[in-house]
């Protein structure tokens, strides 16, 4: 699927993939630095590195902190990092080749420089500037999804943040694993076009029911699933 994602992306297309930092893979002999190995696979496909975002959950779940038999002992402490990250990459151009409508709208204002020349400068609301700075900082705080519709359910905050910073309005967002439709909801809410792919009929029905209200209240008149 990585190869197919690379193939269908435009030359200035970006990709954002949410992965755990580490995993326990018995077939590989135990724990591995998963995000690093996943990036190497992306690099082999042809993706170029755009950045990495550290995800910080507002109320992180707790996991086993010590291995069996090592409680209050140095013998075999199980040191586990439950954190996840988002790997950002692009196809050929890190800069958008076609200008689009940004997520943040500034107000053009004429100002004079020290020599009295009049220039036009864009001014942005403080909240917009704060949001932009938080998105480019590389650490995104998100609220956990407590209403799990499927095993594939994840926080709406994550795709929303990625879509805001990586795409223009009316761009096409592709989710190759649609699940319960979280990315589609984020894209629809933020005025992006979207395509969702899902093999499970059960998940497809769940996503369809979830996305329909947002489509009906927004600009799309027809939902094809």
Language-model segments: what does each one mean?
Residues 203, 222-225:
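Charged C-terminal helix
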Residues 208-223:
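Short, conserved SAM-binding/catalytic segment
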Residues 1-206:
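Core catalytic lobe of class I
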């Amino acid at each position: 699927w990585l190869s197919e994602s690379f193939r269908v992306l435009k030359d200035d297309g970006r990709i954002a993939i949410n992965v755990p930092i580490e995993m326990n893979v018995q077939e590989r002999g135990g724990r591995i630095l998963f995000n690093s190995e996943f990036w190497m696979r992306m690099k082999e496909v042809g993706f170029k590195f755009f950045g990495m975002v550290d995800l910080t959950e507002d109320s992180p779940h707790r996991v086993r902190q010590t291995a069996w038999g090592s409680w209050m002992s140095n013998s075999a402490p199980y040191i586990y990092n439950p954190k996840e990250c988002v790997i950002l990459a692009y196809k050929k151009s890190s800069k958008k080749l076609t200008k689009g409508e940004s997520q943040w709208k500034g107000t053009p204002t004429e100002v004079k420089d020290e020599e009295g020349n009049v220039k036009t400068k864009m001014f942005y609301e403080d909240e917009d500037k704060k949001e932009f700075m938080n998105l480019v900082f590389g650490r995104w705080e998100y609220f956990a999804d407590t209403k799990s519709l499927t095993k594939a359910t994840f926080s709406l905050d994550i795709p929303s943040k990625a879509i805001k910073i990586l795409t223009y309005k009316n761009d096409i967002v592709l989710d190759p694993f649609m699940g319960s439709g979280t990315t589609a909801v984020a894209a629809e809410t933020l005025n992006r076009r979207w395509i969702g792919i899902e093999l499970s009929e059960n998940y497809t029905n769940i996503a369809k029911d979830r996305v329909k209200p947002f489509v009906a209240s927004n600009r799309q008149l027809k939902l094809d699933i």
